[in-house]
């Protein structure tokens, strides 16, 4: 005989069902990548499709799933629909999920070494060390992400230097300081590639593993172009 659940029990199970809506929306590698990209800046569907190397149709479907779970929001700008994270806590959720995976799954480090095969070639520096170095003007901070992501928010004092611009703009960088590169975070190779190029030009280079999401989670503020006006 099936026992009838009390109203209290039904409400409790309903709560867990609602919590599971969030985990279900995140239980897809493509949607996790979209979250990671939206931490950097708001993007259109076409932009996200290009960055994630997916079709526009598939990207749109994944975004709709995230939207139903209220993890992303969208608004129309001209002819485009622009997506962004619904709450800063979502960035923190992704960062902590990634850290749990790194702690619990030995395969993460193995695959990370295959993906970022230069990641052990440069000295690591923490967000706290970067913040301290900026206060006494000891480091030159290079943002290796695309310029639109830099404009959406970057580490204080950082210079926008996308990897594909380094060769033609290297003369803009002063010598005499330690260069620190960063990009979207640990699951991104842009800062590694920038470090290789800058090192070849004779600059002492360190790599910040954190991106803008981790920087904010550490308690530090971002800077935007309008902040300097």
Task: Locate predicted features.
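Catalytic cysteine-centered active loop of the rhodanese-like fold, especially the PTP/DSP P-loop
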Residues: 71, 173-216
């Amino acid at each position: 005989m099936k026992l009838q659940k009390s109203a209290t029990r039904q409400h409790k199970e309903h709560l867990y069902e609602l919590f599971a809506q969030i985990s279900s929306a995140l239980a897809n590698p493509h949607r996790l990548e979209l979250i990671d990209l939206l931490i950097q800046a708001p993007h259109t569907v076409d932009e996200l499709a290009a960055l994630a190397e997916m079709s526009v149709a598939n990207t749109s479907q994944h975004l709709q799933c995230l939207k139903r779970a209220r993890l992303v929001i969208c608004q129309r700008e001209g002819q485009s629909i622009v997506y962004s994270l619904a709450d800063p806590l979502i960035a923190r959720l992704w960062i902590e999920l990634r850290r749990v995976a790194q702690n619990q799954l030995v395969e993460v480090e193995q695959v990370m070494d295959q993906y970022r095969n230069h990641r052990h070639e440069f000295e690591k520096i923490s967000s706290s060390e970067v913040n301290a170095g900026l206060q006494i003007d000891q480091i030159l901070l290079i943002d290796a992400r695309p310029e639109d992501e830099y404009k959406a928010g970057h580490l204080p004092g950082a210079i926008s230097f996308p990897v594909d611009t380094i060769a033609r703009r290297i003369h803009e960088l002063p010598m005499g300081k330690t260069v620190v590169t960063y990009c979207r975070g640990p699951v991104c190779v842009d800062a590694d590639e920038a470090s290789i190029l800058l090192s070849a030009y004779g600059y002492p280079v360190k790599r910040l593993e954190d991106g803008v999401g981790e920087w904010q989670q550490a308690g530090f503020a971002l800077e935007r172009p309008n902040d300097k006006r």
